[in-house]
């Protein structure tokens, strides 16, 4: 039997080694909530939602646009607007360098994408955050493009939808980034006078200056399940008030229970829900 031990194991090792070499990397994803190992292709087909526990993974802005809008007749607005560096800001590396590297990596000029299109044949203007662009932070370009989205919706007499995914104001632009809170809120005040619906969708995370301005000004505020929503983070609040926060504090379910948001909708149902809401809110 010794020849079996000496011959077969090495052969098996060689075969397994060859198989491993032929298997491409990055085929699997472990769910951070339930630890289930998921095939990435299946996860993508399920809109980045875990088929086992329903956990909503973060999704890119482009994927979300493709998920929400009808395929034909999409028009992007403001895609050539680029941020500047008014403060010549420098932390671990210069702001300009950070911008350039992020723009090249994502092929986006900034953290907000504005697209005119249709949801189930209903005209809409959609503004979607790209969280991978510096944490979806709001600077001058995000503010400008959001106002552009508002103006386009007014011009088209259609609903405005914003999908937020942001850590807040962009510190590298200082006071200019904080001014966008007032700028975007003022634009929505104008928008409301036209009696057109603004639907705000809060995904994980929606924090800081974005949550403290236009993200919470929707006629209808929708959140994705378990999304983190708030101004300061839980650890900051706990260290300030010196108290333990309630279980699930700042999660979508907690906010719904306390009347901060209107509804929680599974990502796989959001397109249908939006079409129904817009039909009721803007029958014309």
Outline where the language-model segments fall.
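Short cysteine-rich clusters marking metal-coordination/redox-active sites
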Residues: 31-34, 50-53
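Conserved catalytic cores of soluble enzyme domains
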Residues: 166-282
């Amino acid at each position: 039997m010794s020849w079996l031990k000496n011959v077969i194991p090495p052969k098996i090792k060689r075969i397994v080694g060859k198989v491993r070499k032929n298997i491409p990397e990055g085929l699997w994803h472990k769910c951070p909530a339930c630890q289930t190992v998921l095939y990435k292709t299946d996860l993508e087909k399920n809109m980045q939602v875990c088929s086992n526990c329903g956990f909503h993974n973060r999704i890119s802005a482009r994927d979300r646009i493709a998920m929400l809008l009808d395929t034909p007749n999409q028009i992007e607005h403001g895609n050539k607007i680029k941020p500047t560096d008014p403060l010549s800001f420098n932390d671990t590396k210069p702001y300009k360098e950070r911008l350039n590297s992020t723009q090249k990596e994502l092929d986006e000029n900034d953290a907000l994408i504005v697209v005119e299109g249709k949801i189930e044949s209903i005209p809409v203007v959609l503004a979607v955050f790209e969280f991978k662009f510096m944490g979806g932070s709001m600077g001058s370009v995000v503010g400008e493009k959001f106002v552009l989205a508002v103006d386009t919706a007014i011009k088209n007499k259609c609903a405005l939808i914003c999908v937020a995914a942001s850590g807040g104001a962009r510190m590298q632009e200082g006071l200019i980034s904080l001014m966008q809170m007032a700028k975007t809120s003022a634009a929505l005040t104008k928008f409301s006078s036209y009696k057109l619906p603004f639907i705000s969708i809060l995904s994980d995370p929606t924090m800081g200056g974005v949550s403290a301005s236009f993200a919470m000004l929707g006629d209808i505020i929708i959140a994705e399940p378990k999304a983190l929503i708030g101004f300061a983070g839980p650890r900051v609040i706990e260290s300030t008030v010196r108290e333990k926060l309630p279980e699930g504090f700042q999660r979508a379910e907690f906010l719904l229970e306390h009347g901060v948001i209107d509804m929680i909708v599974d990502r796989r149902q959001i397109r249908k829900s939006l079409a129904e809401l817009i039909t009721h809110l803007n029958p014309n």
